[in-house]
C-alpha cells in the first residue's frame, strides 16, 4: 500500500510517495500547473498513481494559524475533490500549516543553495505533509 502526498500551490504541485510499508515519505517530483488556465496536472498525478500502485492520496490543506480555511485552502479542497472523483481513490486533506517553512529549514540546514531550494521546496513540503500523516498512523 503506497500513499501519495501532494503540496498544491498556484503554479506547482509538490509530490511525495510513501514506501510500501507506509513508514517513510520521499520526494518524487514537482508538477507544473496553471490555475488561471485550468491546467491542474491531473494526468500526471494519475500516471503516478498507476506507476506506484497508490491507493490513497494525502493533500496538504493550508489553514490559517487560527484554524480557519482561507482562499488557498478552499482551492486545495476543490483540488482534492476533483482527484477523488477522477481517480476513485480515498483522498485525505491534511493540515499543512508551516510545512513549506519546515521544508525550507530542512534545506537550509542541509546547506542547499537558494537556487536549488527554490527548485525542490514544493517537493520537500509534500514530504513534510506526507510524513506528518504517516507518523500519525
From Swiss-Prot:
Its EC number is 3.1.-.-. It is found in: Cytoplasm. The keyword Cytoplasm applies. This is Putative pre-16S rRNA nuclease. GO terms for cellular component: cytosol. It is an enzyme of class 3 (hydrolase). It comes from Bacillus cytotoxicus (strain DSM 22905 / CIP 110041 / 391-98 / NVH 391-98). Its main location: cytoplasm. One of its GO terms (molecular function) is nuclease activity. Keywords: Cytoplasm, Hydrolase, Nuclease, Ribosome biogenesis. Belongs to the YqgF nuclease family. Could be a nuclease involved in processing of the 5'-end of pre-16S rRNA. GO terms for biological process: rRNA 5'-end processing. InterPro entries: RNaseH-like_sf, YqgF, YqgF/RNaseH-like_dom, YqgF/RNaseH-like_dom_sf.
